[in-house]
Amino acid sequence: MHTDAISVERVTPDGASLDAINRVVEGAVMGWRLAERVKRLVLPSYLYSAAELTSLDVIVARETAGMVVGVATLESAAAIDCPHDRRGLLLHGLYIAPAYQRRGIGKRLLDEVFAVAHAARVDGVLVKAQHAAEPFFVARGFTVLVPTDPQRQYAHRLWRAVRRA
């Protein structure tokens, strides 16, 4: 499938889209290179609740039939996690359905993430990534942040500044 057939849009999730979003999250998590038991144990902590989604900006990628095949969620980033004197949005989650991975959908979702960040007039986007996902974000212009407070800060934080016109 060509990525032009995929639409990317911000949404206000309802019950049906919550289920569709969580199907994408479940498929992505179950595709991780971890022991099956570990994936089953961690999966519930990655699934979204309706209450959580009300406090997040939600962006979905849909195929032409309307099926959700990717999701990105954003929230304000804590000041301690951002580079010094910077304000940012935290990319809370970025998930692509396994059958749609490696087709540019993650990049398209990130493009919309940066449009949201630009509109919010923040300095950049912060990611707390799984170690295996770091190369994906580095290839898209993110830089690894060295923890200044290893007891408090997540080890795999990445930052990309919002380009101002």
Region locations from a protein language model:
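Conserved catalytic-core motifs of GNAT/GCN5-like acyltransferases
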Residues: 126-128, 143-160
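A short beta-loop-alpha structural element at the N-terminal edge
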Residues: 6-23
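Conserved GNAT acetyl-CoA-binding A-motif
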Residues: 117-130
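Conserved acetyl-CoA pyrophosphate-binding loop and the N-cap/start of the following alpha-helix
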Residues: 100, 104-112
